[in-house]
Amino acid sequence: MKTLTPCAFTLGELAERLKARLVGDSDRRVTGLATLLDAGPNDITFLANKTYLKYLPDTRAAAVLVHPAHGTDAPCARLELENPYLGYAELSRLFDPLAGQAPEGVHPSAVVAESARIGEHVSVGPQCVIEAGAVIGDGCVIGAGSIVGADSEIGADSRLHANVTVYHGVSVGRRAILHSGCVIGADGFGFAHDGQGWHKIAQLGGVIVGDDVEIGSCSSIDRGALGDTVIGNDVKIDSQVQIAHNVQIGDHSALAGCVGIAGSTRVGSHCMLGGGVGLSGHLTLCDGVQVTGMSLVTNSIHEPGVYSSGTGAMPNGLWRKNAVRFKQLDELAKRLSRLERGASDTP
């Protein structure tokens, strides 16, 4: 495991890493990554949005990551590439001072079952619990207070931040990142009603999480009732997201904060759900669907594209007037229909 040390790279090294065209001194060293406005003489910055072109001439950065068409006003060295934002993503990982920082080994306060299997170069933090039959892959970091339930598996090079709970019978793929407070494999919301009260339905399935998945803090993915809840490869899930039992999320999809997906709904690959989106149960969203924030989806979507529902914010007085008119729409429609029938009967 790496220790916390300052990051320093020459512009030549970064250009080679990013496959960028360097205009400037290849031996110039940079030690940080910052915005156009905040960057100092030892930093590299980036320009990925033309809105910020006006700030480029005044940046104090040593170098800027920029599209070839937008860097002519740069007062510093340039690393030119077609997708500066993607380049910024890679730079952010290079300059992350905490990347890989964790002491190798099992902390004395951790509880590890005899039948659990711990891979090589693993860090298990204070107060962790690794239950019977669990498998922790090579290079994993299990943060303080995290629990990996019986017969669950954490794939190689994954990281569980502090206080993550993985229930029994859960499979997490390689290179996953699970943030603090997320819960994988809790019981789904399953109950039968007899007319008087509720009777619990045991949730007998599991959860399968693919490779390269990131799950935000305080998000919940429930185990299947029968069969598994499945999260595909390279899925990105924001904080405070609720995914119910037997949901399936396709590869490369992204869910923003506070999304809620009811049971047995299937979301295709390359889908994007904005913040606060709600999906009713037993629906299917095809590949390539984008749903804008706070929308409610109550029917399946079979064509890729952008979908929205709801009403955007407006001054309260106008909203109240429109709300009153909305309540009158049914009666207005009936009156219009009667008028149209009367007009058609007129010679």
From Swiss-Prot:
Gene3D superfamilies: 1.20.5.170, Hexapeptide repeat proteins, MurE/MurF, N-terminal domain. The keyword Lipid metabolism applies. GO terms for cellular component: membrane. It catalyses: a UDP-3-O-[(3R)-3-hydroxyacyl]-alpha-D-glucosamine + a (3R)-hydroxyacyl-[ACP] = a UDP-2-N,3-O-bis[(3R)-3-hydroxyacyl]-alpha-D-glucosamine + holo-[ACP] + H(+). Pfam families: Hexapep (PF00132), LpxD (PF04613). Its EC number is 2.3.1.191. Pathway: Bacterial outer membrane biogenesis; LPS lipid A biosynthesis. GO terms for biological process: lipid A biosynthetic process. Keywords: Acyltransferase, Lipid A biosynthesis, Lipid biosynthesis, Lipid metabolism, Repeat, Transferase. One of its GO terms (molecular function) is N-acyltransferase activity. The active site is at H245. HAMAP family: LpxD. This is UDP-3-O-acylglucosamine N-acyltransferase.
